[in-house]
Amino acid sequence: LFRSVYITFADPAFEAYCLEHFDIDHDGRISRYEAQRVLKMDCPDRGIAHMWEIGEFSRLERLDGSGNDLTQLDLRKCTLLQTLDCSRNRIASLDLDGLRALLELNCADNALTLLDLKSAGALRLLDCSGNRLVTLDLRPCSERLKADAGGNPLLTTVYCRASQSVSADGHTEIIVR
């Protein structure tokens, strides 16, 4: 029964990518069975506007969706995700809630005004440069975090721990606590 439940894709470019790489039985459709076998998805620069079905790929450990036309990305069901590159999109909000395994995040060159890292306790590498962030709290992240927050013209304050390495523009105050 599980093998015969198929995913309906809203975005033709995302569907084409998935069919090209994950259609195990070559029937021209992606079943939930096929989706749950996918651990890595590398789909940069493919003109993808929506990945609304990304939650069906719940065993994903790595996702590279950089250089597309994404405005949002709902990863709440992708709780095993360790590496995420969603840079060079138009994402205004990124919900990382529940992504406790996330080690690397590249969300540079988007339209982010807020980046909530409360659930990102394992995060070791962050590039959030080139956004519209106003404040950034890195304290919930790994004490070995390396972060690049440059190119955020509205960023006034970054909160971090003494053991974390943070780079930001000269107008940004870095407060160590």
Question: Where are the regions that the model predicts?
Answer:
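N-terminal capping/linker segments that flank leucine-rich repeat
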Residues: 2-62, 79, 142, 153-177
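Canonical leucine-rich repeat
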Residues: 49-54, 73-75, 94-96, 115-117, ...
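Consensus "Asn ladder" position of solenoid repeat domains
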Residues: 46, 68, 89, 110, ...
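Short stretches within intrinsically disordered, low-complexity N-terminal or propeptide regions
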Residues: 103, 122-124, 170
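Glycine-centered tight turns that cap/initiate beta-strands
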Residues: 56-59, 80, 90, 101, ...
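Right-handed parallel beta-helix/beta-solenoid
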Residues: 75-80, 96-101, 117-122, 138-143, ...
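Conserved hydrophobic beta-strand positions in leucine-rich repeat
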Residues: 39-44, 61-65, 82-86, 103-107, ...
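A generic tandem-repeat structural signature
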Residues: 66-74, 78-93, 99-109
